[in-house]
Amino acid sequence: MQVVSFEFINYDTDRYVYENHYVMAGLTKKGIGWAFTTLYASNWHPVTWLSHMLDVELFGLKSGFHHLSNVFFHSVNTLLLFWILARMNGEIWKSGLVAALFAIHPLHVQSVAWIAERKDVLSTFFGLLAIGSYLRYVKCPKIGRYLPILIFFVLSLMSKPMLVTLPFVLLLIDYWPLKRLNFKMLSYSDGNESQMPSKVFLIVEKIPLFLVSSVSCMITLSVQQDGGAVGSLALYPLHLRIVNALVSYASYIGKMIWPVNLAVIY
């Protein structure tokens, strides 16, 4: 909670809050329209802009409360993660341990203590709600139970387009721990069961999510290119991009185990 005493910094927070006159005006009709149409900061994330506007509307420029909003979402995300894991495997203590590591791991400091990274905790919040809704849906597949998944997924991508892989994550969850691919009946930690759908259905039911993900990828790529955030293949050849991805994966896995030499610039 020491972040409540932190001030604004001039690293992206200026563009997201205190030098952005749309955000500084709070929640206004003009600001809401701007949030849904702007490509400012090389991103299209209207929900994130609305979140910052709401902070200003409620707290003005009291930086501690803006930090507190990040802490709030991170805390809720921790509880959601615990609930989802416990719901899937019925292991309370193991789920609690994973959630605790998620809550306090140093790799999350940047997302929580940096006001400009509101988009990170906000996107995770809606993404976890989408996964939680999916667990409810698979017990009894109906349109009424599917819509919340789609809505939360869209809101997550409108906060930050980092969960475009969610349809694949749900397929992985189908395989394990839900075992929708292997058994005639689905078992849940509360003792309930439901009939296993066909493998084709598992793909078909996620087509709307794949479509949303594809649209988000196209929008993001276009916006990032226009903002100069994506280098050309001539500047960064494909083989260098592949090597960079592999090194990045190895680096992040290593820092998950031993989080040293962390820096804001990544």
Model regions and ranges:
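Polytopic membrane enzymes that build or remodel cell-surface glycoconjugates and lipids
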Residues: M1-Y266
